[in-house]
Structure formats: C-alpha cells, structure tokens
Regions:
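Fe-S ferredoxin-like electron-transfer domains
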Residues: 2-135, 141, 148-168
Length: 170
C-alpha cells in the first residue's frame, strides 16, 4: 500500500510496519528539501547549529545543497530580554505554540495568516516584549530549528570585559 503516517495508524495484531524502506527514505528526502527551501539556511552562524533537528535530518537523509527559494522575510524579533524569534527559520511544527499555550498557559506566540503566508508571530504589529511572555524559554527549548533561541549576552559580557573603566573578575 501507500505511505501512512504513524500518528494516524491504528495498531492491529500481526501488522508489519516498515519504517526504513527506499520509498520512505525518498519521501523523507522530498519533505526535507521542501522544508529547507522555505528555511533561511545560515547554519554556520545559527545559534542552534549542532543542535538543530532539521540539520540532523538533512545529514541523516543525505539532503545537501538545497538553496532557499521562498523563505519568510519577517524581521527578527529580539525585543524580549530572554528569547529571540527568527520567523525565517520556522518550519511551522507548532511545538513552541503548544508549549506556550498548553504548558505555560500564556499564549504569547502563535501562527498568523494562512497557507504559504503562515508565519510565527506575536500578533500583527506586536513584538514578544509587548505580550504576556514570562521569559521562561520553554518555547526555545522545544524549537527544533533556530526559529526561537535564548538570547545571548555574550556581546554585553565582552563589552564589559574590554571596558577600561570597569574592573571585571573572570
């Protein structure tokens, strides 16, 4: 038969399930290519490099040299003291939005628009700092790509270390 999603299959006694056939590998490669075409690929400088599930799967299934075709051009939102949102790296998996709503009971982030125009957002015209975000970072912890990351203070620390008017213990 055809390919059936594991999450929709009803288990049956004696059923044989194959999860690593040539057909499935080819199907997964196709999905990964589509995801990567809609994803701004700057893996070498991405904070998630080495921890990115999309990067892991691309390596695992031999998907390389995919050029972004039409990635989201929404601006990066670094207004929050804790979390940075880069919508161009979002694969619309929904892990962050479910975590924010269901685990934290906050709903600071969600998807807006429909179809190819769908983007991760805090609402039209709003930034994360304008929401009821508690800066818990759970959304970033759940994000499989670099769409949500914990804000780094490395630049501020280096500025302080290199400031001749300050005494800094390292």
């Amino acid at each position: 038969g055809g390919i059936e999603a594991a999450c929709t299959m009803v288990p049956k006694d004696g059923a044989v399930v194959r999860t690593n056939t040539a057909q499935l590998r080819e199907f997964r490669q196709g999905i990964l290519k589509l995801l990567l075409e809609g994803h701004r690929t700057e893996c070498a400088t991405c904070p998630q490099s080495g921890k990115c599930k999309l990067q892991d799967y691309a390596k695992r299934y031999g998907v390389a040299d995919v050029k972004p075709v039409d990635y989201c051009r929404e601006p990066v939102d670094d207004s929050s003291p804790a979390v940075v949102i880069d919508p161009s790296k979002c694969i619309l998996c929904g892990k962050c939005t479910r975590t924010c709503l269901q685990l934290q009971n906050v709903n600071a982030i969600d998807f807006i628009n429909r179809g190819n125009e769908t983007v991760l957002s805090c609402g039209i015209g709003y930034k994360l700092a304008d929401t009821n975000c508690t800066s818990c970072g759970q959304c970033a912890a759940m994000c499989p790509t670099g769409a949500l990351t914990i804000k780094s203070d490395a630049a501020r620390v280096w500025d302080a270390i290199n400031d001749p008017t300050k005494k800094v213990a390292v």
